[in-house]
Amino acid sequence: MEAAPGTPPPPPSESPPPPSPPPPSTPSPPPCSPDARPATPHLLHHRLPLPDDREDGELEEGELEDDGAEETQDTSGGPERSRKEKGEKHHSDSDEEKSHRRLKRKRKKEREKEKRRSKKRRKSKHKRHASSSDDFSDFSDDSDFSPSEKGHRKYREYSPPYAPSHQQYPPSHATPLPKKAYSKMDSKSYGMYEDYENEQYGEYEGDEEEDMGKEDYDDFTKELNQYRRAKEGSSRGRGSRGRGRGYRGRGSRGGSRGRGMGRGSRGRGRGSMGGDHPEDEEDFYEEEMDYGESEEPMGDDDYDEYSKELNQYRRSKDSRGRGLSRGRGRGSRGRGKGMGRGRGRGGSRGGMNKGGMNDDEDFYDEDMGDGGGGSYRSRDHDKPHQQSDKKGKVICKYFVEGRCTWGDHCNFSHDIELPKKRELCKFYITGFCARAENCPYMHGDFPCKLYHTTGNCINGDDCMFSHDPLTEETRELLDKMLADDAEAGAEDEKEVEELKKQGINPLPKPPPGVGLLPTPPRPPGPQAPTSPNGRPMQGGPPPPPPPPPPPPGPPQMPMPVHEPLSPQQLQQQDMYNKKIPSLFEIVVRPTGQLAEKLGVRFPGPGGPPGPMGPGPNMGPPGPMGGPMHPDMHPDMHPDMHPDMHADMHADMPMGPGMNPGPPMGPGGPPMMPYGPGDSPHSGMMPPIPPAQNFYENFYQQQEGMEMEPGLLGDAEDYGHYEELPGEPGEHLFPEHPLEPDSFSEGGPPGRPKPGAGVPDFLPSAQRALYLRIQQKQQEEEERARRLAESSKQDRENEEGDTGNWYSSDEDEGGSSVTSILKTLRQQTSSRPPASVGELSSSGLGDPRLQKGHPTGSRLADPRLSRDPRLTRHVEASGGSGPGDSGPSDPRLARALPTSKPEGSLHSSPVGPSSSKGSGPPPTEEEEGERALREKAVNIPLDPLPGHPLRDPRSQLQQFSHIKKDVTLSKPSFARTVLWNPEDLIPLPIPKQDAVPPVPAALQSMPTLDPRLHRAATAGPPNARQRPGASTDSSTQGANLPDFELLSRILKTVNATGSSAAPGSSDKPSDPRVRKAPTDPRLQKPTDSTASSRAAKPGPAEAPSPTASPSGDASPPATAPYDPRVLAAGGLGQGGGGGQSSVLSGISLYDPRTPNAGGKATEPAADTGAQPKGAEGNGKSSASKAKEPPFVRKSALEQPETGKAGADGGTPTDRYNSYNRPRPKAAAAPAATTATPPPEGAPPQPGVHNLPVPTLFGTVKQTPKTGSGSPFAGNSPAREGEQDAASLKDVFKGFDPTASPFCQ
């Protein structure tokens, strides 16, 4: 009757026009329905405008909906719709909006608003629906206007019963019956409508009751009833908008109001309802239109009906969980807006009475009962899938698509068996599929490859896969899997051939059925599958079959196995190609204890380090009785084995975890403990020699097959580590692995028992494991290196993420930072980082070093040997020197062959000490390393960066939470930890810290970054880790780190100039110099803290200057660096300062103080003496930061300059890790040095010394101020100045000596 004001009123005769807008439903409905006659014009008006408006303005006026709701108040249809829309909208919207809408409804009862609302409603529905599927489908209907739907709607809505009969029905429950009539018809599609109706009624009862007179209520009731019927009748035929519009056209008022308002209000209600809301809106509109006619002059009769309907609606809504419904009436009023929110009126009040959303049908039938809560959703779903099923229960289209989030609360029917996607659920393989029986992918019904190919499944009745006779479908799946496996096998064969060409004889691949795809033991799966499984695991799920085994490895086996552990799988795969990488991964994997502490169950990285893993893995399994890799857990392996083909994924998760062999090494012990059943550590280690045998035995036992080349291929595929351990394992394992000591000695230096290479933070057991693993890896490395040469590249590519940190170093200079950061995060999140750090330092580092040491292979090996015992022990206790040298060597080797000699030199000094334990293995490894060196230089680069990086990282990230209290461990991961603390506290520091994580810096500038980073990471972290103890270790490690750092710097310098020269040149070029502004931030905040810290930095600087000039020779240089490294400033400055200063002096001081070899001391004084003068000195100014602008630069410069340098040491390093890539390795040191010269002597002193402590404090301050976390240079400077006082205050409470690293 009242055409929406905004609605262009088409002539009443414009029935046809409405059809045009919503041709589907509109065309016939208007003429058809009695209501259509009067309503048609309005409906048409609304229809035409509504479709446009709705589509056009759906989103336009989110609040218009509210207005519309008000409108709806005027016209019951309108309020209804608005409420619905609101409800729907408010589904997403908040109660506030509901209130808004109510107010607006009350304020505005214009049809235009209704139209807008409906438009918005639709839009919101779209928004909502897209997200919530409910609304979305409605929208599509709206936009599409399916003729049938609309036609149906029209007819239904137009059905005479609507206005007259329903008026009465609604009051009494009879309405449900009429409604049911329609409902049954509509219910499918209109179930939601009914909900909406109910909501609307409920809302209307309250809102509209208030707003609308009884008359309105009667009309509204009629409209609602009709609407319901129409909805039900059209059963989705509503054609969304058209329907509401078209056959809703029947009420004149419905037309204008129902349409405009109905649309608006109803739309709103519908909006509240959900996807069906569009339909509901339309239906509502139409109903409203129907009511529209009577709406204006709603009689008491109508009112009663309406109120009854409202009550029912409310009940249904409430019962339905008006929450879902969102208060359909409410929507318009805003009351209905919330699903459950409604004033409680529509849904809450009434809905509660009714059953629940499940009652949608009934509610629909019942009048509006159903229309209430559930229905809105039902409709939402229905709309899309409203087409058919039954009155209120249309099959939920979203459920069919697997996207229905309503679950049991969905108003649409989920009673349909969805055909499973003919694909194995990769999560099921792992034993963890959250969707359980609801998973669209195949679980236990997937054919067991092992059983169907060999006729025998080791898992027997416990197999995760189906042993039922093959059907056409399952046979097709099996054939496809086997074909994939065969393809993978072909790839494996190629890989094996390539390896053989390289002089690497991979172990024979296990027979197809062997254990390539052991069924993963579900939860244990991740751990259970080990090398043996690791391979199978690596192999795709399908690899289990004979042909598949090879393919799985290359194609997916590694990946699937590693799905959880991509790095691992990469490594494993790479291991297959590059065992060293796998070994690295293995080493990287934290020890079982570590993993446990970290909660990282990442055998993955461990797994990837298959070589070792396989050894241990195989070894224990051998003892265990090959069939079950001990690592895999007997049950695990067997399970995995059989199903592995299908469970490849399970294996993959398990693979990583499963590759206990590898994990066993580093993290494997825990894994191993499973498999070997021996102590995780020692048990695992001893098995390592057996591992290869075990592999053979395992495969033989498993499949009763001998270790065939296929096995090796699989092993390679699955775990290159296996291959590594296999051959290298046989030779190396027996030699060193056989000896516990040799394991510790020869084993990965970092990981071996000696734990010398192992981070001190590691528990003794873990350390022993780490050492053993390292040794084993070393032993395996000869072979592994060969494999690694080829496989390392692959692994690096595959390893990307986890291996990325080191592979990036080699391959990607700049992007490596990103990858490193990414990998660091990954590692941090999943034990791999810790293990990587550890491994890199010890185990990983060893294989890599050996591999990467090629240039300084023996040095690297000795270092590695040293790393596990001497270097690691010394390094952990004294010396990142060995670790640094190791990392630096690999890095140097990797980053710069030129630098490698230096690295070797440094390494050899370190190597001798470190190589004590590894002496013998190094010899073997040297050969292997040499072989690998040429090809594996890349690997060394990866390992080396990983080495120190990993060590610190593992410690930092993995053990950061575990060993944060441990100074030593903190330092190692202090950098990583610093990252977090620094992120939390000083971002600038984190930048520097990032530098320490050489990965980023290294990758951007592998050589310099690795050196500085490693030196800082390995040495400084150690120094940091043990501020006190670090002095000793730093002394040892300091010299070594000096060499390493120097060598790294020199490498960079080789590019830039001499060590010292690079420092100076580095500074200017280094972004740090550019970033100097960061320091100002530090400087400013540091001003207050700088004063206090300045004193400390001063002393630290004094040593640092000394170290700086001496650079290589002066551990004292560490003092300034130590403050940096320690970030404690005072704490490590004294004792740790010496060590740190070596590293810092080397990386930071050389670059910084190369200008004044002896200026370091002078700058130290300057730093203490001239905070302002220290401007040049990033650090000095950082501490005193009197001149934030320049100092910041200096500080940043230094942080970047001295990646390992004071600033760069930890916080700045971290910062630099991001920025460092810009400076690049050489640039950073050069920048450091260069900046000081420009700045003058004072800057240098300040730079190296104060900035670290100061930076730590300052940066912390600044970051807190929010200066600019990583980049203190920019906003930090300003913020530093602005927040200098607050930062000072903040940091006054902070112990400058308490570095974030050591927190």
UniProtKB/Swiss-Prot annotation:
Family annotation (Gene3D superfamilies): Zinc finger, CCCH-type (4.10.1000.10)
Keywords: Chromosome, Coiled coil, Metal-binding, Methylation, Phosphoprotein, Repeat, RNA-binding, Transcription, Transcription regulation, Transcription termination, Zinc, Zinc-finger
Residue stretches of biased makeup (Acidic residues): 53-73, 135-144, 194-218, 278-304, 358-369, 486-496
UniProt subcellular location: Chromosome
Ranges for region Disordered: 1-388, 486-571, 605-685, 710-955, 996-1288
Composition-biased stretches (Basic residues): 100-130, 238-251, 323-346
Residue ranges of coiled coil: 95-128, 767-800
Pfam families: zf-CCCH, zf-CCCH_4, zf-CCCH_9
Gene Ontology biological process terms in this record: DNA-templated transcription termination; lncRNA catabolic process; negative regulation of DNA-templated transcription, elongation; negative regulation of lncRNA transcription; nuclear RNA surveillance
Biased composition regions of type Low complexity, renumbered to the chain: 904-918, 1097-1110, 1224-1234
Quaternary state and interactors: Interacts with WDR82.
Entry's family note: Belongs to the suppressor of sable family.
Listed name of the protein: Zinc finger CCCH domain-containing protein 4
Source organism phylogeny: Eukaryota, Metazoa, Chordata, Craniata, Vertebrata
